[in-house]
């Protein structure tokens, strides 16, 4: 059974989980979180994020030891899954060796599971490769596991083979899930997936692919992100039909429309928007910023739905102008984003990298915080990022977009509730302010008043997060 719900560690929550020992989740709290996601919320998969984060590499051992009754009845690796996101050495040079350590940990986790279950069960057998841009990157991870982990058992060390000395290495192979995060990667996603399947055709029963929503939206704007992700979903379906190998898409969605609109009160809209997606992520805000009963009900609702065919999408030529306007407005807003970002609280322990914000993003030469902090900063000054470059789109063009982006008007109207025309005009976005006014949006005066205070350097960013229902 391919998972329908993947719980992740994305730090977009304003509430502190009841089990947390600190506002910044790490270590033991994340072990508890994984069990909570499985046992209470009903998630059938937990992402374990080694990419730029400090996570516990003994997670399998600790889960099985601490919650034996649950995991006897819910077999890890069969009924539910734990899936690491690993560093991509092509991009993250400083974390490159962590990839090998993580792959070695897969075999160690299988040893713990063998003792616990009394059988050869691989609790981890897939990894997510972020920032994938080529089939070679996927193949390298696949073969690194085979050659550096499994086949090393054949080697002789002094007077004995590794297998005789240390034991077998299981599983004998892993699945690699490419995560596509840039526009160029999304364009090539189907071809990359096809090439990998052809290489592995006699070796795999199915292939999972992962499409990001947050980073494309931050880099190119909401409309472009939705368009290219939907186009990629449509293209991989054609690959599935041609090769007769099932392809199961995953989509990474967070709470605000910019990041996918995945909130417990909006799951129907998200499933309708992405009908061909098999696995939806639920991030920290989804899990902790809403009543537990609402979260459980929303998870059950998603799990009860069935996949449908994707919506055919052609890339509208006017997106070129939209993206240019988006980049122009980001350049204007960058100083404000970077200033307010310092006030957004951290919710996860991350490893520090060189850069203004530790693990930051570079967008066309501008250093910006990561997507969650980026989104939180803009919402906090009354400029929801979903609305950027809206002034470049005519009513007719929006109608064209609505033919494949089903919830476009609802998503824009959601963001408009938190929009401050006054702040927009002060930073030089008068045309955007005038365009938003044309929609005559219903706004939240209390929110906008506080956002205007935050813009001046004061105010309460967490009060605003509570009012809108997510941090970023």
From Swiss-Prot:
Keyword Magnesium found: yes
Molecular function terms, GO-annotated: magnesium ion binding; phosphoenolpyruvate carboxylase activity
Reactions performed catalytically: oxaloacetate + phosphate = phosphoenolpyruvate + hydrogencarbonate
EC number of this enzyme: 4.1.1.31
UniProt organism field: Pyrococcus furiosus (strain ATCC 43587 / DSM 3638 / JCM 8422 / Vc1)
Record key words, sorted: Carbon dioxide fixation, Lyase, Magnesium
Enzyme superclass (EC): lyase
Record has Transmembrane helix as a keyword: no
Assembly with partners or alone: Homotetramer.
Protein name, UniProt field: Phosphoenolpyruvate carboxylase
């Amino acid at each position: 059974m391919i998972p329908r719900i993947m719980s992740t560690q994305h730090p977009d929550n304003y509430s502190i989980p009841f089990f947390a020992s600190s506002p910044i989740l790490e270590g033991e709290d994340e072990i508890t979180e994984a069990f909570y996601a499985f046992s209470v919320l009903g998630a059938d998969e937990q992402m374990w994020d080694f990419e730029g984060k400090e996570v516990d590499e003994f997670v399998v051992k600790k889960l099985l030891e601490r919650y034996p009754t649950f995991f006897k009845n819910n077999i890890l690796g069969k009924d539910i899954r734990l899936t690491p996101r690993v560093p991509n050495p092509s991009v993250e040079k400083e974390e490159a060796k962590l990839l090998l350590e993580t792959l070695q940990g897969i075999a160690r986790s299988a040893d713990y599971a063998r003792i616990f279950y009394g059988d050869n069960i691989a609790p981890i057998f897939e990894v997510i490769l972020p920032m994938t841009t080529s089939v070679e990157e996927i193949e390298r991870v696949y073969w690194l596991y085979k050659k550096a982990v499994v086949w090393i058992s054949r080697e002789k060390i002094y007077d004995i083979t590794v297998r005789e000395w240390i034991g077998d290495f299981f599983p004998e192979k892993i699945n690699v899930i490419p995560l596509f995060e840039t526009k160029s990667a999304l364009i090539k996603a189907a071809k990359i997936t096809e090439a990998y399947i052809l290489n592995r055709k006699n070796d795999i029963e199915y292939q999972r692919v992962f499409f990001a929503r947050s980073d494309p939206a931050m880099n190119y704007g909401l409309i472009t992100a939705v368009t290219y992700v939907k186009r990629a979903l449509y293209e991989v379906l054609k690959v599935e039909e041609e090769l007769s190998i099932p392809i199961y898409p995953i989509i990474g969605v967070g709470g605000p429309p910019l990041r996918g609109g995945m909130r417990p009160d909006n799951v129907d809209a998200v499933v309708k928007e992405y009908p061909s997606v098999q696995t939806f992520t639920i991030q920290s805000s989804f899990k902790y910023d809403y009543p537990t009963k609402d979260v459980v009900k929303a998870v059950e609702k998603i799990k009860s739905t069935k996949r449908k065919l994707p919506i055919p999408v052609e890339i509208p030529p006017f997106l070129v102008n939209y993206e240019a306007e988006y980049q122009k407005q980001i350049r204007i807003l960058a100083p404000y984003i970077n200033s307010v970002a310092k006030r957004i609280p951290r919710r996860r322990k991350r490893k520090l990298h060189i850069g203004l914000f530790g693990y930051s993003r570079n967008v066309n030469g501008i250093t910006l915080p990561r997507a969650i902090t980026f989104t939180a900063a803009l919402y906090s000054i009354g400029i929801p990022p979903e609305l950027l470059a809206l002034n470049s789109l005519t009513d007719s063009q929006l109608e064209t977009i609505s033919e494949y982006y089903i919830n476009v008007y609802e998503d824009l109207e959601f963001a408009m509730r938190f929009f401050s025309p006054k702040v927009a005009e002060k930073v030089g976005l008068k045309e955007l302010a005038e365009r938003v006014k044309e929609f005559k949006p219903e706004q939240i005066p209390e929110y906008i008043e506080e956002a205007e205070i935050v813009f001046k350097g004061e105010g309460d960013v967490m009060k605003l997060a509570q009012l809108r229902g997510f941090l970023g």
